[in-house]
Structures are given as structure tokens and as C-alpha cells.
Design a protein with these regions (language model features):
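Short beta-strand/loop segments at the ligand-binding rim of alpha/beta enzyme cores
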Residues: 16-29, 74-83
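Extended, intrinsically disordered, low-complexity segments
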Residues: 122-128
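Generic alpha-helical hydrophobic packing signal
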Residues: 13, 43, 70, 75-76, ...
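Non-cysteine beta-strand/loop elements that form the S-adenosyl-L-methionine
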Residues: 43-50
Length: 128
């Protein structure tokens, strides 16, 4: 539900009518959400919320060689944007190889505290 109890389907139809030339990206958490966004006609399908919602906690986008992304790519007509936990060059390369239109690298390059934590976590495990 959206504000005022409106369903996504109805909300998106209204917005699409009001802004017919605007590109719309769906930030999704599950394969089901991505398939639904594709059916609704979102221009871009994002994996942005995988692992970040109550229903997907503990899910990692890279599991089983990016099974979520592979499942979506086989079943949608709109471009898929890999976003969320794409935090290494190897992951970015792999999602492009699988067929994603683009990849978004967020926190791992834009938040110094995240970058620093990755280094300190690795270094605190070093035995002297």
C-alpha cells in the first residue's frame, strides 16, 4: 500500500499518465516484486532492496551465482539494474556478464565509514 491506502498498481497508472515521458525505476526486494514491476511497465527493474526488507533479511544478491538476478533476467522484458550489495569489482563484472543493463555501486565507494570498516574488520583478524 502507498500513502492514503493506494495500491501500487493504481498509483503507478496515475503517475505514468501524468508523466508519460518520464522513466521509472522500480526498487525491488524479491523476484516476485521484480516480475510485478515488469508487468506494470516500469522502465527499469532494480534489485535495490534485496536483503534489506523484513521478507528478504538474510538474502544475499550474490547467492548461488546471483540466482535472483538470473531468474529475473529470464522472465522480464525491461532492463535490470543490479543495485544493492554489489560491493566488489568481481560482483559488478559478473552481473554485467549475466545480462544486467547496468550496475550501481553505492555505499562501498560513497561512504568512507563503510570503506574504513571493511579494512579494519580485515585487519583485526590478523594474528600477530
Amino acid at each position: 500500500l502507498r500513502p492514503n491506502g493506494e495500491f501500487l498498481d493504481d498509483f503507478f497508472k496515475e503517475v505514468r499518465l501524468k508523466y508519460p515521458d518520464q522513466l521509472f525505476m522500480a526498487d525491488c526486494a524479491s523476484v516476485q516484486e521484480m516480475l510485478h514491476a515488469d508487468e506494470l511497465g516500469f522502465d527499469l527493474i532494480g534489485t535495490t532492496l534485496v536483503g534489506y526488507t523484513d521478507d528478504t533479511t538474510g538474502t544475499h544478491i550474490e547467492e548461488d551465482d546471483f540466482a535472483i538476478i538470473r531468474a529475473v533476467l529470464k522472465n522480464v522484458t525491461h532492463p535490470v539494474i543490479a543495485e544493492g550489495n554489489i560491493d566488489t569489482p568481481a560482483k559488478a563484472k559478473r552481473v554485467i556478464e549475466l545480462g544486467c543493463f547496468s550496475v550501481v555501486i553505492g555505499s562501498s565507494i560513497t561512504r568512507p565509514q563503510v570503506i574504513t570498516k571493511r579494512f579494519t574488520d580485515a585487519l583485526t583478524k590478523v594474528e600477530k
